Amino acid sequence: MKLSFTKMHGAGNDFVVLDGYSHTLPPLTDVQVRALADRHFGIGADQLLVVEKPTVDGADFKYRIFNCDGGEVEHCGNGARCFVKFVTDRGLTDKRSVRVQVMKGLITLTMQDNGEVVVDMGAPVFEPAQVPFDASGLDGRTDGNDTLWPLDVGGATRWVSTVSMGNPHAVQVVDDAEAYPVLAEGPLIERHARFPKRVNAGFMQIVSRHEVKLRVYERGAGETLACGTGACAAVAAGIRRGLLDTPVTVHTHGGTLTISWDGAHDERAALTMAGPATTVFEGEIELNV
């Protein structure tokens, strides 16, 4: 089976994008997704993005996301920016703002004149059961307007904020994000028994009230150069704890994102993310698995 694809990245978080809107794509198995995402024998990517026609009213497109392990996930902020650049560059829309159907609802994506994309990420969710996070039997610690939860991570206690941005996140504040053992602790948090759907593990260093450094060990993908929903979750947790003020510049290994959230005044407010989206190359691949 021969597939046409576009390789893109958002702040280094890289994607294989498939057009299932202009023509029908065959269903992809998890084995095929892993083959496409393989960096040695395939194209190589953190996630696979599929553009489809919407199945709900009020949406212009449908957006599906598959991690490099083959599993389908709810949301990807960096992918969303690449998504709107893809449909714009392909002439699939002439709108500056589009409404896109994702697993958890609808999101709004806006292409700016400077080439950056603003994503309306919706309101963060902190209720443990909705993340989902099993807080039963745990004594949480109040910090500002947030609750920190103790996790046993390799025999050490780590205090985390739990946040859903349509997908689950556990965020902890660290002194030095660069030196922190993310590759050792990330997998332990990702698969911690308290998170029934696994979790994205974020490690945030506060630089100032408007600036942070962030590393994220993503569920099903490992550490990536950037994670859009992870940046949103980290900033939301920081504002809720009284450590940050909007807007916040988030420095990742792959680039810089700007996150804005008026959560200090209204936690139901939508959070927005602005950042780059880049097309790397296009091609065809013979898929023989």
Curated annotation (Swiss-Prot):
BP GO annotations: lysine biosynthetic process via diaminopimelate
Positions that bind substrate: 13, 47, 67, 77-78, 167, 200, 218-219, 228-229
Keyword Cytoplasm appears in the UniProt entry: yes
Pathway: Amino-acid biosynthesis; L-lysine biosynthesis via DAP pathway; DL-2,6-diaminopimelate from LL-2,6-diaminopimelate: step 1/1
Enzyme class of the recorded protein, top EC level: isomerase
InterPro entries, sorted: DAP_epimerase_AS (IPR018510), DAP_epimerase_DapF (IPR001653)
GO MF annotation terms: diaminopimelate epimerase activity
Active-site residue list: 76 (proton donor), 227 (proton acceptor)
Reactions that this protein is recorded to catalyse: (2S,6S)-2,6-diaminopimelate = meso-2,6-diaminopimelate
EC numbers: 5.1.1.7
Localization, UniProt: Cytoplasm
Positions bearing the site annotation: Could be important to modulate the pK values of the two catalytic cysteine residues: 169, 218
Subunit text: Homodimer.
Biological function: Catalyzes the stereoinversion of LL-2,6-diaminopimelate (L,L-DAP) to meso-diaminopimelate (meso-DAP), a precursor of L-lysine and an essential component of the bacterial peptidoglycan.
UniProt cross-references to NCBIfam families, sorted A to Z: DapF (TIGR00652)
UniProt name for this protein: Diaminopimelate epimerase
Native source organism of the sequence: Burkholderia vietnamiensis (strain G4 / LMG 22486)
